[in-house]
């Protein structure tokens, strides 16, 4: 049963990155895959508390990199255990990123990102 949750959460991470992030669908797909009280730590940035704080920080990050998000083209490495997942994302022309996420009821409650 736990493996089913990991599989669902990994698919949700694909949707989050490939649809929500790549298309800047902040209030739709992006928000849907996070809890309202999500805590996110992006390496080198202050942590955010709550989905709106996280969205605002990601909008600012995208603006600081030219106004278009660096596209996540694939997750060549993805695994999980219990309520946790880890994905390595290929970024078009920019290397890789890593996201470790703790899931609660199908949404990210804690997230750690290295870009």
Residue positions per predicted region:
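C-terminal and inter-domain tail/linker signature
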Residues: 1-115
């Amino acid at each position: 049963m736990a493996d089913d949750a990991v599989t669902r959460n990994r698919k949700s991470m694909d949707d989050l990155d490939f649809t929500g992030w790549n298309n800047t669908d902040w209030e739709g797909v992006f928000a849907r895959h996070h809890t309202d009280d999500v805590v996110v730590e992006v390496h080198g940035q202050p942590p955010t508390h709550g989905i709106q704080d996280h969205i605002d920080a990601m909008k600012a990050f995208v603006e600081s990199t030219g106004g278009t998000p660096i596209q996540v083209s694939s997750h060549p490495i993805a695994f999980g255990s219990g309520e946790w997942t880890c994905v390595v994302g290929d970024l078009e022309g920019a290397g890789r990123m890593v996201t470790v996420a703790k899931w609660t009821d199908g949404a990210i409650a804690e997230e750690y990102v290295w870009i």
